[in-house]
Curated annotation (Swiss-Prot):
The CXXCXGXG motif repeat ranges on this chain: 141-148, 158-165, 184-191, 198-205
Gene: dnaJ
This protein's name: Chaperone protein DnaJ
Lineage: Bacteria, Bacillati, Bacillota, Bacilli, Bacillales
Family as reported in the entry's similarity comment: Belongs to the DnaJ family.
Entry superkingdom: Bacteria
Database matches in PROSITE patterns: DNAJ_1, DNAJ_2, ZF_CR
Length: 370
């Protein structure tokens, strides 16, 4: 199935700014997040939206996508990579050293990196937390100390490759007879032959276990960000260091707050009377309620800033702000007494907008007159 255009997925123009792309992503991610949207296709749509954002928010990826779209520009050349040209890669390796030379199969090598996705509640990401996770990973076998051989014995040099981990294969080519180096399939490139295998690991030198790891989630971590735990990945090879563990965070949306970087946004519903006469209201923040004065005559859409009431910066650079946007609620059901009072008010005010809006309505009148 062909992929949809990334701009179409986010519903933005091809010339959209980075802020417009980010705003569209936040809106759609909130809409299709699996923890909020229980539709069968919500998770697929969420992944599609994230994939589109990851590409269009990165200048290099965006430039590549704008030029080539979903098409791999190298696919007409064997999908890219010299390895796809079969025997010719070995010829170039011989003349130009493309293979990087002969590697020692017994040299210490770092273990593979691992990735773990951790889901956080909105406020857990804001304030941070300490938790314990359990991950499956390969660890060095303690019975054989990673050698793969039965205790009291040692691995022997592979008789087929002489311990090099590679076999030399002669081949006729248009350039003449050449020698190609291939990984020895007898020892799988290790250069070792284990006659008496360790009963615990079966000769692999590693065993798969579930490891408990303590994780300190930093305050202010955001959705999609990651942290690295050095040395918590797969065990190293031939005594090499262990790989790293990368923890990627999936932050659930909040029903009241929205987050953009270190700033928090929310809407406060107010009545016509409150905004017309002014009022002092209580506003929920991440750290509890605070009082906010609403000046008389406040219009719907007006935004107030609560400095320092946002999210702590994950790198320790201060704290964001909270933005409170006023939303005037029009009552749907009125008693007869309330209707009578509103009619009386309309007669007293002349049924026309406030003076401060005269300039706006003057523009509307001029527009109708042409």
């Amino acid at each position: 199935m062909s992929k949809r255009d990334y701009y179409e997925v986010l519903g933005v123009d091809r010339n959209a700014s980075a802020d417009e792309v980010k705003k569209a992503y936040r809106k759609l991610a909130r809409k299709y997040h699996p923890d909020v949207n229980k539709a069968p296709d919500a998770e697929d749509k969420f992944k599609e939206v994230k994939e589109a954002f990851d590409t269009l928010s990165d200048p290099q990826k965006k430039a590549h996508y704008d030029q080539f779209g979903h098409t791999d520009p190298n696919q007409g050349f064997g999908g890219g990579g010299a390895g796809d040209f079969g025997g010719f890669s070995d010829i170039f390796d011989m003349f130009f050293g493309g293979g990087g030379g002969r590697r020692n199969p017994n040299a210490p090598r770092q273990g593979a990196d691992l990735q773990y996705t951790m889901t956080l509640e909105f406020k857990e990401a804001v304030f941070g937390k300490e938790t314990t996770i359990e991950i499956p990973r390969e660890e060095t076998c303690h019975t054989c100390s990673g050698s793969g051989a039965k205790p009291g014995t040692k691995p022997e040099s592979c008789p087929h490759c002489g311990g090099s981990g590679q076999l030399n294969i002669e081949q006729n080519t248009p350039f003449g007879r050449v020698v190609n180096r291939r990984v020895c399939h007898h020892c799988e490139g290790t250069g070792k032959y284990i006659k008496h295998k360790c009963a615990t690991c079966g000769g692999k030198g590693k065993v798969r276990k579930r490891k408990k790891i303590n994780v300190k989630v930093p305050a202010g971590i955001d959705h999609g960000q990651q942290i690295r735990l050095s040395g918590q990945g797969e065990a190293g090879v031939n005594g090499g260091p262990a790989g790293d563990l990368y923890i990627v965070f999936n932050v659930k949306p909040h029903e009241f707050f929205e987050r953009d970087g270190d700033d928090i946004y929310c809407e406060m519903p107010l009545t016509f009377v409150q905004v017309a006469l002014g009022d002092e209201i209580e506003v929920p923040t991440l750290n509890g309620k605070v009082k906010l004065k609403i000046p008389a005559g406040t219009q719907t859409g007006t935004s107030f800033r609560l400095r320092g009431k946002g999210v702590p910066n994950v790198h320790g650079r201060g704290q964001g702000d909270q933005h409170v946007q006023v939303r005037v609620i029009t009552p749907k059901q009125l008693s007869e007494k309330e209707k009578e009072l509103l009619r009386e008010f309309a007669q007293m005010s002349g049924g026309r907008p406030d003076e401060q809006d005269d300039s706006f309505f003057a523009k509307v009148k001029r527009a109708f007159k042409g």
